[in-house]
Amino acid sequence: MSQEIRAIVRIGDTDLDGNKQVAYALAKIRGIGIASAYAICWKLGIDPHAILGALPEDQINKLDWAVRNLHELAPAWFLNRRKDPETGRDLHLIGSELVLAAKRDVDLMKKLKSWKGVRHSLGLKVRGQRTVTTGRFGATAGVTKKKAAAGK
């Protein structure tokens, strides 16, 4: 009795490898890591070591719902966007929403001309790292060898 395994499973607007274990396949979604994937599986009662492509359709639909609505399942400290500046709600963003939110945050810092925004706009390091010797940009000055002595 061989079970059909789907090669590609679509969860959270991301194509996942159906031949991988559920937890490791879910971790390929941007915004979901291994810890989040195991937490989702535990919350739904799905074996995290089962093969994703072998799961029945109803469990895949449950996984998709849980990935999109993790803010309803998990406590606030587990989410990746607590107290969203626009809505004030605790959210867990995935995929392109996460990338766009980070870009909006940087653009807001630039617009407000905060210290971090100024550093971002100048292309410098933002988090207090040293910049004297590292983080240089532009062409590198190569080192040239002297010509070998002719008589030797």
From Swiss-Prot:
Organism phylogeny: Archaea, Thermoproteota, Thermoprotei, Thermoproteales, Thermoproteaceae
Keywords assigned by UniProt, alphabetized: Ribonucleoprotein, Ribosomal protein, RNA-binding, rRNA-binding
InterPro entries registered for this protein in UniProt: Rbsml_uS13_C (IPR027437), Ribosomal_uS13 (IPR001892), Ribosomal_uS13-like_H2TH (IPR010979), Ribosomal_uS13_archaeal (IPR019977), Ribosomal_uS13_CS (IPR018269)
Organism: Pyrobaculum aerophilum (strain ATCC 51768 / DSM 7523 / JCM 9630 / CIP 104966 / NBRC 100827 / IM2)
GO MF term list: rRNA binding; structural constituent of ribosome
Family that this chain belongs to: Belongs to the universal ribosomal protein uS13 family.
Quaternary data: Part of the 30S ribosomal subunit. Forms a loose heterodimer with protein S19. Forms two bridges to the 50S subunit in the 70S ribosome.
Keyword RNA-binding: yes
General function of this protein: Located at the top of the head of the 30S subunit, it contacts several helices of the 16S rRNA. In the 70S ribosome it contacts the 23S rRNA (bridge B1a) and protein L5 of the 50S subunit (bridge B1b), connecting the 2 subunits; these bridges are implicated in subunit movement.
PANTHER family for this protein: 30S RIBOSOMAL PROTEIN S13/40S RIBOSOMAL PROTEIN S18, SMALL RIBOSOMAL SUBUNIT PROTEIN US13
Designated name of the protein: Small ribosomal subunit protein uS13
NCBIfam families xref list: PRK04053.1 (NF003140), uS13_arch (TIGR03629)
A Gene Ontology cellular-component term: small ribosomal subunit
UniProt xrefs under SUPFAM superfamilies: S13-like H2TH domain
Biological process (GO), any one: translation
